[in-house]
């Protein structure tokens, strides 16, 4: 553990310790909390910029509100490292995102101070509204519910759906809009802070309500004029007309790094007797750490780094990551086809589409955190003859499943889905694991579902998708590097629904769907050394299956094992159903499917987790030896 000097923070284990401090100590506490956060993340890696941006807000919220009785719900959750330090988890903060350590997000089973788990964006207001309504039903009049949501997350429709509902219900809910990017209405110094304090005071609210009651007794013409005049004045001075229309009482904008501004406003809104309130705070990602302030995008998620220089520790490698291979392949295809366009949902760098945007800026569309819109937007482009590639993480594609079915699949529109971060993703854990895309896509009629076994196969699949116009098509690939093979300038077009055999044998058939192929080949070597002749097949397609190849493998082998990084119901399940329908399970063939277990996988090292669940060479060999009844003796 690094020797960070934090004498005041050392006195705070839980929020009640924080609330025992004089208010004049809080600036020093915030500075120490920021120092501790920087030092901890330098050891573990993780999300840095977002947490540094809410240090003062975190201190203020736990100081003003009676947590955990009052509920603070953090949207997404990657900004909660300071929150974790203040809520009894400082001793474990240097285990963040490590196996057996703290989650990088909020997690209900981890602490009573995490009332709602997160990892995906834009859920906090809906969850908070549910809790606020539950408190009202139970007549818990003292409990406050606070949802903290970033301006980026406000680009998702779900946030506005929740606000609309909260306004209609007149629920006692406090929403903190953490504006650290869009600058909807940046604060303008002391005047803005003064106005925020003014409009948050009970006296202003009571006056406003009395004027409203009086105006309602006047003819409608006068009431409409009065309402519009007030909206104009408040919108001109302090913003917030949109939120007013949704039924929220708007306060702000205020400086989210100035405790002298935050504390009085939060005290005032804490006592607001009824209806939802929105407090607009403006913050800066990476606040207080110059390298992060200078490059907030690069310090959103970081590897371990040197605190003094800010230099991140990265393993040197000349092997391209799968994301980079996809990016280069898509740019190459777009050079040959002017109908190709790229679409991302607020992840241009993570999906590699930033390179596409540099080359074809007019054909690149970042729609914000709006996966549902992204898919239907792509469907509209496909209707007009364009070839949209929707590049999206597997875990986020789940958010657009109705659009995939209703707007794309039923209409057989040729939308291309480039599914990044497929399979186990490591430190981000269950909320980000790409476990389910094979299952929920391969069940759709006439939906082509592909997975490459290496980076060259990924290039082939990008070109295949670009050439395919008969309906929707997808290809999935993992986080991390390929295997380091030489790559051509451009991939080849694959025959739809046709796999390939990499190695011929006659007793054991190993059928791989995806990038576990290197482990499958190692397993085949070990089985061969034990006298078990092994065929290795690259399925390429989960849908449509290569039926001819699967029939041959079933008829010519004693044991057939499928290998995939995905949940129950994926490639192995589809192959088993085909074999059953064909009567190929009735003549002694023994089939096993290696996949994810029926549970959510927690954060940890990908190599260790995949080994534990049997998706490495040793696990494959053990499975085969168990089936054939041999004693397992592995070196």
From Swiss-Prot:
Known catalytic reactions: D-glyceraldehyde 3-phosphate + pyruvate + H(+) = 1-deoxy-D-xylulose 5-phosphate + CO2
Show the SUPFAM superfamilies listed in the entry. Answer: Thiamin diphosphate-binding fold (THDP-binding), TK C-terminal domain-like
Q: Which cofactor does it need?
A: Mg(2+); thiamine diphosphate
Tell me which Gene3D superfamilies the record gives: 3.40.50.920, 3.40.50.970
Per UniProt, the keywords (alphabetical) are: Isoprene biosynthesis, Magnesium, Metal-binding, Thiamine biosynthesis, Thiamine pyrophosphate, Transferase
Report the SMART domains cross-referenced here: Transket_pyr (SM00861)
- A Pfam family hit: Transketolase_C
The answer to whether keyword Magnesium applies is: yes
GO molecular function list: 1-deoxy-D-xylulose-5-phosphate synthase activity; magnesium ion binding; thiamine pyrophosphate binding
Any note on cofactor binding?
Binds 1 Mg(2+) ion per subunit.
Output the GO biological process annotations, alphabetical, semicolon-separated. 1-deoxy-D-xylulose 5-phosphate biosynthetic process; glyceraldehyde-3-phosphate metabolic process; terpenoid biosynthetic process; thiamine biosynthetic process
Question: In UniProt terms, what function does this protein have?
Answer: Catalyzes the acyloin condensation reaction between C atoms 2 and 3 of pyruvate and glyceraldehyde 3-phosphate to yield 1-deoxy-D-xylulose-5-phosphate (DXP).
Query: Which family does the similarity line name?
Result: Belongs to the transketolase family. DXPS subfamily.
Query: By its UniProt entry, which NCBIfam families does this protein fall under?
Result: dxs (TIGR00204), PRK05444.2-2 (NF003933)
Q: Tell me what this protein is called.
A: 1-deoxy-D-xylulose-5-phosphate synthase
Provide the organism lineage as a comma list: Bacteria, Pseudomonadati, Pseudomonadota, Alphaproteobacteria, Hyphomicrobiales
């Amino acid at each position: 553990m690094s020797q960070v000097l934090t004498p005041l923070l050392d006195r705070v284990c839980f929020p009640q310790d924080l609330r025992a401090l004089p208010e004049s100590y809080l600036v020093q506490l915030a500075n120490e909390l920021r120092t501790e956060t920087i030092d901890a993340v330098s050891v573990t890696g993780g999300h840095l910029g977002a947490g540094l941006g809410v240090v003062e807000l975190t201190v203020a919220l736990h100081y003003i509100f009676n947590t955990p009785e009052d509920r603070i719900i953090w949207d997404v959750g990657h900004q909660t490292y300071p929150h974790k330090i203040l809520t009894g988890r400082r001793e474990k903060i240097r285990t963040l995102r490590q196996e057996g350590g703290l989650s990088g997000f909020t997690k209900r089973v981890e602490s009573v101070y995490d009332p709602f788990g997160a990892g995906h964006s834009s859920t906090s207001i809906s969850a908070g509204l549910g809790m606020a309504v539950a408190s009202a039903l139970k007549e818990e009049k003292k409990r406050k519910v606070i949802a903290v949501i970033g301006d980026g997350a406000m680009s998702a429709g779900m946030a506005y759906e929740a606000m609309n509902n909260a306004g209609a219900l007149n629920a006692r809910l406090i929403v903190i809009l953490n504006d650290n990017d869009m600058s909807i209405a940046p604060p303008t110094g002391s005047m803005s802070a003064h106005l925020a304090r003014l409009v948050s005071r009970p006296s202003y609210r009571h006056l406003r309500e009395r004027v409203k009651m009086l105006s309602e007794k006047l003819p409608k013409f006068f009431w409409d004029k009065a309402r519009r005049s007030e909206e104009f004045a408040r919108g001109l001075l302090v913003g917030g007309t949109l939120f007013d229309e949704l039924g929220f009482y708007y306060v702000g904008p205020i400086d989210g790094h100035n405790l002298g501004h935050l504390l009085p406003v939060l005290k005032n809104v804490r006592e607001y007797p009824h209806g939802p309130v929105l407090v607009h705070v403006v913050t800066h990602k990476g606040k207080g750490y110059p390298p992060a302030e200078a490059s907030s995008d690069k310090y959103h998620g970081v590897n371990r780094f040197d605190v003094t220089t800010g230099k991140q520790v990265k393993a040197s490698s000349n092997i391209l990551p799968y994301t980079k291979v996809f990016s280069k392949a898509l740019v190459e295809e777009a050079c040959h086809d002017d109908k190709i366009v790229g679409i991302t949902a607020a992840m241009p760098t993570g999906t590699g589409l930033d390179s596409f945007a540099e080359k074809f800026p007019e054909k690149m569309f970042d729609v914000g955190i709006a996966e549902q819109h992204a898919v239907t937007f792509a469907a509209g482009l496909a209707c007009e003859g364009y070839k949209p590639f929707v590049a999206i993480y597997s875990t986020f594609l789940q958010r657009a499943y109705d659009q995939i079915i209703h707007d794309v699949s039923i209409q057989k529109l040729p939308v291309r889905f480039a599914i990044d971060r497929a399979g186990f993703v490591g430190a981000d854990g269950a909320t980000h694991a790409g476990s389910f895309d094979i299952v929920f896509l391969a069940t759709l009629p006439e939906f082509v579902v592909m997975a490459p076994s290496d980076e060259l196969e990924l290039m082939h699949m990008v070109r295949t998708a670009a050439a395919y116009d008969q309906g929707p098509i997808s290809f999935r690939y993992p986080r991390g590097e390929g295997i380091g093979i030489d790559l051509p300038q451009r991939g080849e077009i694959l025959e739809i629904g046709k796999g390939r055999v990499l190695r011929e044998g006659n007793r054991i058939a190993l059928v791989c769907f995806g990038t576990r192929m290197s482990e499958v080949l190692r397993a085949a070597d070990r089985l061969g050394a034990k006298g078990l002749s092994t065929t290795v097949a690259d399925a390429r397609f989960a849908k449509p299956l290569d039926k001819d190849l699967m029939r041959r493998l079933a008829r010519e082998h004693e044991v057939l094992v499928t290998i995939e990084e995905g949940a129950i119901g994926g490639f192995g399940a589809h192959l088993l159903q085909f074999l059953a329908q064909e009567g190929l399970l009735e003549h002694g063939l023994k089939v096993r499917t290696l996949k994810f277990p029926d549970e959510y996988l927690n954060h940890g090292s990908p190599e260790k987790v995949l080994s534990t669940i049997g998706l490495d060479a040793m696990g494959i060999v053990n499975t085969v030896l168990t089936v054939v009844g041999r004693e397992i003796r592995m070196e």
